[in-house]
């Protein structure tokens, strides 16, 4: 069978992360279950399988990318039909036989939605803190990883209504790096302690109460994954199904937020 790649969007909140784990529900576990039900494979995992990234529990994705050897009849729409609503496959690409969704990715982009409705006065401080984390640094104090911690980040902050939107792009990321970058920016924005950034980026380990914890995973989205020479085709039926599903989820959340706002008026 030919190697094929698929774009996957998912609401990560119901899942214990992307990567398969025993005894808990994960996005990859749901993908494998769907493929087994469709008789695409019957082993431990599909031949040639790899994914662009391993998002943490609660993190969502717009363009997670998985690739494996798959029959031509497996369209995104057919794939989605065997999946639960929070997971939607919406595009596909024919890939070379040696294609690897992890190793062949040239860039990954994450977006973090920081709810800050009453904090416009400190937007410049937040942007300045993020700017100091942009570029090439050793982020050993912002990840549990102990090796390969030097990364080059391109990060920006924009205001969108009640939200500060942080966009971070890199060739690859250490574990929890984006969430800890956001957490550090939030701390510096709140306290004005810009020296904290120099300490965290320094050579000495920063741990315990002085360490930087990861920010809440729920506002984080894996927005894009780029590959050289790979052209994805949007399955319009699958894409429309995804839009309808996520619009319904958005409406539900708006209603819940309105009720919570009413209760907060006590």
From Swiss-Prot:
Q: What EC number(s) would the UniProt record show?
A: 5.4.99.12
The set of disulfide-linked cysteines is none
- Record-annotated active site: 56 (nucleophile)
Q: What does this protein do?
A: Formation of pseudouridine at positions 38, 39 and 40 in the anticodon stem and loop of transfer RNAs.
Q: Which Pfam families match?
A: PseudoU_synth_1
* Gene Ontology MF terms in the entry: pseudouridine synthase activity; RNA binding; tRNA pseudouridine(38-40) synthase activity
UniProt superkingdom: Archaea
The alphabetical list of record keywords is: Isomerase, tRNA processing
CDD domains in the cross-refs: PseudoU_synth_TruA_like
What is one Gene Ontology biological process annotated in the Swiss-Prot or TrEMBL record? tRNA pseudouridine synthesis
Keyword check for Zinc-finger, yes or no.
no
Identify this protein by name. Answer: tRNA pseudouridine synthase A
Whose protein is this, by species? Answer: Halobacterium salinarum (strain ATCC 700922 / JCM 11081 / NRC-1)
Question: Which reaction is the catalytic activity of this chain?
Answer: uridine(38/39/40) in tRNA = pseudouridine(38/39/40) in tRNA
Q: TM segments?
A: none
Of which family is this protein a member?
Belongs to the tRNA pseudouridine synthase TruA family.
List, alphabetically, the Gene3D superfamilies matched: Pseudouridine synthase I, catalytic domain, C-terminal subdomain, Pseudouridine synthase I, catalytic domain, N-terminal subdomain
List the InterPro entries hit by this protein, alphabetically. Answer: PsdUridine_synth_cat_dom_sf (IPR020103), PsdUridine_synth_TruA (IPR001406), PsdUridine_synth_TruA_a/b_dom (IPR020097), PsdUridine_synth_TruA_C (IPR020095), TruA/RsuA/RluB/E/F_N (IPR020094)
Residues annotated as binding substrate: 110
Against NCBIfam families, the record matches this protein to:
PRK00021.3-3 (NF000622)
């Amino acid at each position: 069978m030919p190697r094929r790649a698929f774009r996957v969007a998912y609401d990560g909140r119901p899942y214990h992360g992307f990567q398969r784990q025993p005894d808990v529900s994960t996005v990859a576990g749901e993908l494998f279950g769907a493929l087994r039900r469709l008789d695409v494979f019957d082993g431990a995992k599909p031949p040639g399988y790899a994914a662009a990234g391993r998002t943490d529990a609660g993190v969502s994705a717009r363009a997670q990318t998985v690739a494996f050897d798959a029959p031509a009849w497996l369209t995104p729409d057919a794939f989605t039909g065997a999946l639960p609503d929070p997971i939607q496959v919406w595009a596909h690409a024919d890939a070379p036989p040696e294609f690897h969704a992890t190793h062949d990715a040239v860039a990954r982009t994450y977006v973090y939605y920081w709810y800050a409705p009453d904090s416009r006065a400190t937007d410049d401080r937040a942007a300045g803190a993020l700017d100091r984390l942009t570029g090439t640094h050793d982020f050993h104090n912002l990840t549990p990883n102990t090796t390969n911690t030097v990364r080059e980040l391109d990060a920006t902050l924009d205001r969108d209504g009640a939200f500060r939107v942080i966009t971070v792009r890199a060739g690859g990321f250490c574990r929890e790096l984006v969430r800890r970058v956001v957490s550090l920016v939030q701390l510096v924005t709140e306290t004005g302690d810009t020296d904290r950034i120099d300490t965290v980026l320094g050579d000495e380990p920063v741990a315990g109460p002085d360490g930087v914890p990861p920010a809440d995973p729920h506002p984080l989205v894996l927005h894009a994954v780029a590959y050289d020479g790979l052209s994805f085709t949007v399955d319009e039926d699958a894409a429309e199904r995804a839009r309808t599903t996520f619009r319904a989820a958005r409406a539900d959340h708006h209603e819940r937020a309105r009720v919570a706002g009413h209760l907060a008026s006590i």
